[in-house]
From Swiss-Prot:
Component of the ubiquinol-cytochrome c reductase complex (complex III or cytochrome b-c1 complex) that is part of the mitochondrial respiratory chain. The b-c1 complex mediates electron transfer from ubiquinol to cytochrome c. Contributes to the generation of a proton gradient across the mitochondrial membrane that is then used for ATP synthesis. Heme b b562 binds at residues 83, 182. InterPro entries: Cyt_b/b6_C (IPR005798), Cyt_b/b6_C_sf (IPR036150), Cyt_b/b6_N (IPR005797), Cytb/b6-like_sf (IPR027387), Cytochrome_b (IPR030689), Cytochrome_b_C_euk/bac (IPR048260), Cytochrome_b_N_euk/bac (IPR048259), Di-haem_cyt_TM (IPR016174). Heme b b566 binds at residues 97, 196. Keywords: Electron transport, Heme, Iron, Membrane, Metal-binding, Mitochondrion, Mitochondrion inner membrane, Respiratory chain, Transmembrane, Transmembrane helix, Transport, Ubiquinone. This is Cytochrome b. Pfam families: Cytochrom_B_C (PF00032), Cytochrome_B (PF00033). It is found in: Mitochondrion inner membrane. The chain crosses the membrane at residues 33-53, 77-98, 113-133, 178-198, 226-246, 288-308, 320-340, 347-367. It is a multi-pass membrane protein. Heme 1 (or BL or b562) is low-potential and absorbs at about 562 nm, and heme 2 (or BH or b566) is high-potential and absorbs at about 566 nm. One of its GO terms (molecular function) is metal ion binding.
Length: 380
């Protein structure tokens, strides 16, 4: 008699996805981040659900309700600290996951890649509206500055901003709708993640060599299920350490002050995981230009598969493309640093150079490197 997990309508789907799934035998720890992102999503949804039970989406009560959660709710401080720092870990995992895709050429699975870019945009949107909810100074001014950017769009801009605000400034209506979006989006992310996995399992995973691995596949369980479990342990241990020992390390002290429309903070900046995009936005001395640069700093990922010029898929055997990849990583770190600095010399020019280099690497240097490597291979 056949095993129930292979015949039951529901269990056979799970079996095909996480038990008997044929997996390349040589995928490294860089392939752990997909499952870690799933863990982050579950952690964030559960902690967020319990926080939402005690949170009040009203400008007179929001800040107090967060304080109430931390002081009076059983383990409320822990829920809040895990949720706030879990967002940082979510972005660490998502950036490493994308970096893995760029390095090993996983982007050539176009459907999976494009849904991944959509997931990135959804997660960024969720994090942005979530940051507004505690209604501290940086929450309020961050919401004001970022939503105001939409006014740069010709003709419809001002109407669009007022429509999003639900009035003539960031007010109660804005907070209420941001809470609605923050609650709704994770479930949309879950659905999109299912699509991401569906398309991935159509082709199977890529591997570090970038070569076809049909000749050497192993079952996902027990080999990679246990490998993922090790990743889970490391992630949860690190997240727990941060949430328990130094929960405010990555936050902004300004957010411990209740929102005040009459007092502008000296430096308005988003959470650290948005600083690279914020630096690109600020490096262009034109409002619409800055908004478009901000948008394209993420959407440029969509054109990466089209700009793949190399005969080889992965960077494993391509030294010059490897060098450019690590220059891109260093450039991202520089942009992140610049995004947190005041708008003054020499930070302005460093930000502008780094922003130009960011786009040049994607659009020119990396495709050129692939083409040159092909030429060298032809001569060999």
């Amino acid at each position: 008699m056949a095993n129930i997990r292979k015949t039951h309508p529901l269990l056979k789907i799970i079996n095909g996805a996480v038990i008997d799934l044929p997996t390349p035998s040589n995928i490294s720890a860089w392939w752990n981040f997909g499952s870690l992102l799933g863990l982050c999503l579950i952690t964030q949804t559960l902690t967020g659900l319990f926080l939402a039970m005690h949170y009040t989406a009203d400008i007179t009560l929001a800040f107090s309700s967060v304080a109430h959660i931390c002081r009076d709710v059983n383990y409320g401080w822990l829920l809040r600290n895990i949720h706030a720092n879990g967002a940082s870990f979510f972005f660490i995992c998502i950036y490493l996951h994308i970096a893995r895709g760029l390095y090993y050429g996983s982007y050539l699975y176009k459907e999976t890649w494009n849904i991944g870019v959509l997931l990135l945009l959804l997660v960024m949107m969720t994090a942005f509206v979530g940051y507004v909810l505690p209604w501290g100074q940086m929450s309020f001014w961050g919401a004001t500055v970022i939503t105001n950017l939409l006014s740069a769009f010709p003709y419809i801009g001002d109407t669009l901003v007022q429509w999003i605000w639900g009035g003539f400034s960031v007010d109660n209506a804005t907070l209420t709708r941001f809470f609605t979006f923050h609650f709704l989006l994770p479930f949309i992310i879950m659905g999109t993640t299912m699509l991401h996995l569906l398309f991935l399992h159509e082709t199977g995973s890529n591997n570090p060599t970038g070569l076809d691995s049909d000749a050497d596949k192993v079952t996902f369980h027990p080999y990679f299920s246990y490998k993922d479990l090790l990743g889970f342990t490391i992630l949860l241990a690190t997240l727990s350490a941060l949430a328990l020992l130094n929960p405010n390390l990555l936050g902004d002290p300004e957010n411990f002050t209740p929102a005040n429309p009459l007092v502008t903070p000296p430096h308005i900046k988003p959470e650290w995981y948005f600083l690279f995009a914020y630096a690109i936005l600020r490096s262009i001395p034109n409002k619409l230009g800055g908004v478009l640069a901000l948008l394209f700093s993420i959407l440029i990922l969509v054109v990466v598969p089209t700009l793949h010029t190399s005969k080889q898929r992965s960077n494993t055997f391509r030294p010059s493309s490897q060098t450019l990849f690590w220059i891109l990583v260093a450039n991202m770190l520089v942009l992140t640093w610049i995004g947190g600095q005041p708008v003054e010399h020499p930070f302005i020019i460093i930000g502008q150079v780094a922003s130009v280099l960011y786009f040049m690497l994607f659009l020119f240097f990396i495709p050129l490197s692939g083409w040159l490597e092909n030429k060298i291979l032809d001569w060999a």
